Amino acid sequence: MTQAFFFLLLVSLVASTLSKEFNFCPRAIDEVCPVKEKRNECCSSKECRFGEMCCSEPCGNVCRVKSDTPLGFPAKEDSNCKVGEIKKKWYQKVWSKITKWG
């Protein structure tokens, strides 16, 4: 009798764990990008491994393990997104020089 009870308890625990939806990005590792150049590891969650999703972080898009709480931001699927180094536009370079002086 006790073996059947523990078996049912184990099955229900596993079922409840597997049914939980993990569809959120975890909190970003850095609040501000510590490196000069940004780099995209992914542009869509389809480019990430199973159990991961493409998340937007200060240094670019990265594949992160899914979370059950919405602490981070998913990457916007954009046709202009390219994997690799993100080149700054001319006005972004000007703005970074202005803010460096101020």
Swiss-Prot record:
- Which positions does the propeptide occupy? 20-39
Classify the main location.
Answer: secreted
Question: What GO molecular function terms would the record report?
Answer: toxin activity
The UniProt PTM text for this protein says:
Contains 5 disulfide bonds.
Where does this protein reside within or beyond the cell? Secreted
Q: In which tissues is it expressed?
A: Expressed by the venom gland.
**What start and end residues bound the annotated signal peptide?**
1-19
Give the CC-aspect GO terms.
extracellular region
- Presence of keyword Cytoplasm: no
Q: Which residues cross the membrane?
A: none
Query: What are the entry keywords?
Result: Amidation, Disulfide bond, Secreted, Signal, Toxin
Which intervals of the chain form a coiled coil?
none
Which parts of the sequence carry Tryptophan amide? Answer: W101
Regarding protein family, the annotation reads:
Belongs to the venom protein 11 family. 02 (wap-2) subfamily.
What is the protein named? U7-agatoxin-Ao1a
Identify the species of origin. Agelena orientalis (Funnel-web spider)
